[in-house]
Swiss-Prot record:
Family annotation (CDD domains): trimeric_dUTPase
Pathway involvement of the protein, from the record: Pyrimidine metabolism; dUMP biosynthesis; dUMP from dCTP (dUTP route): step 2/2
Family matches, as Pfam families: dUTPase
Binding-site positions, substrate: R71, S72, G73, N84, L88, I89, D90, K98
Cofactor: Mg(2+)
High-level lineage: Bacteria, Pseudomonadati, Pseudomonadota, Gammaproteobacteria, Legionellales
One GO MF term: magnesium ion binding
Superkingdom as given in the UniProt entry: Bacteria
Name this protein carries in UniProt: Deoxyuridine 5'-triphosphate nucleotidohydrolase
Gene: dut
Length: 152
């Protein structure tokens, strides 16, 4: 599936010294988002910072949304994850994409201009409505939760 999404460049470095979001490989699910800052920034242990990307997107289609996800290598190797765990971009949002970056490690981490810091994945959306009922049709699972379906 291919969908065209409007992208607005908010900082003149985008497309010049800082690359536009791009898929790293043909099989990549997420577009790499880069940090749009002027100089290196230190993120102290346990600190959370909001990093600009220099871009805004407008999805427009209410059957589509985007999620900002962490890059697995940053989290595993450096303890750098998203401060909000997952960022949800609604179809009608038009502001700058910003990355909430949390250094959960015990070491300082340097973010450099143009670093790939997160990834943007587009996902289909189903807007549900509710039917209020007094009872559910019984399922084999019932009300079991929090580990009830297996060892973990």
């Amino acid at each position: 599936m291919h969908q065209v999404i409007q992208l607005k460049i908010l900082d003149s470095r985008i497309g010049d010294t800082i690359s536009l979001p791009a898929y790293a490989t043909d099989g990549s699910a997420g577009l790499d988002l880069r940090v749009c800052i002027s100089e290196p920034m230190q993120v102290a242990p346990q600190q959370t910072v909001l990093l600009p990307t220099g871009i805004a997107i407008y999805i427009a289609d209410p059957k589509l949304a985007a999620v900002i996800l962490p890059r697995s290598g940053l989290g595993h190797k450096n303890g750098i994850v998203l401060g909000n765990l997952v960022g949800l971009i609604d179809s009608d949002y038009q502001g700058e994409l910003k990355i909430s970056c949390w250094n959960r490690s015990q070491e300082h981490f340097t973010v450099n201009p143009g670093d790939r810091i997160a990834q943007l994945v587009f996902i289909p959306v189903v807007q549900a409505s509710f039917e209020v009922v007094n009872e559910f049709t019984e399922s084999s699972r019932g009300e079991g939760g929090f580990g009830s379906s297996g060892r973990y």
